[in-house]
Design a protein with these regions (language model features):
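Cap/insert and terminal regions of metallo-dependent hydrolase folds
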Residues: 6, 12-15, 23-113
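Short hydrophobic beta-strand that contains or immediately precedes a catalytic carboxylate
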Residues: 19
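Beta-rich catalytic cores
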Residues: 3
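Binuclear metal-dependent phosphoesterase catalytic core
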Residues: 109-126
């Protein structure tokens, strides 16, 4: 069993939650509830399906797009961001589409050096 570490940063009424490698857990939902931004890892199987071609140990410690969508839907961040993306041959749009099965809110796929401004509104500056 590997520990799953995540972080919640609260400052002047704003909050950011960053998951580590994790399967879906009640603790993630508990600590991410109401965050302005939830940055979460995601894993897509090597064949582009939810878990296809994934070694059991890897699949057991990551979250699928649909599972992440469920977490986003339950915690209701102003912006959901994917990071530490482990995926097969899918495009970013495919990743978003898989997530849309369970989450319809604001979602972006994180990029190197992406900047996010958190105020009354949350916006990606790039």
């Amino acid at each position: 069993e590997f520990p799953a570490l995540g972080y919640r940063l609260d400052y002047k009424g704003r909050s950011v939650v960053i998951s580590g490698d994790t399967r879906p857990t009640k603790n993630m939902v508990k600590f991410a509830a109401g965050a302005d931004v939830l940055i979460h890892e995601v894993h897509v199987g090597l064949d582009g399906s939810e878990r296809g071609g994934v070694r059991p140990v890897r699949g057991a410690h990551h979250t699928s797009p649909r599972e992440a969508g469920e977490i986003f839907a339950e915690t209701k961040p102003k912006l959901a961001v994917y990071t530490h993306i482990v995926w097969g041959r899918k495009s970013e749009q495919d990743l978003i589409d898989l997530t849309r099965d369970t989450y319809s809110g604001p979602l972006v796929v994180g990029q190197e050096m992406m900047q996010i401004e958190i105020g009354d509104k949350v916006k990606v500056l790039k």
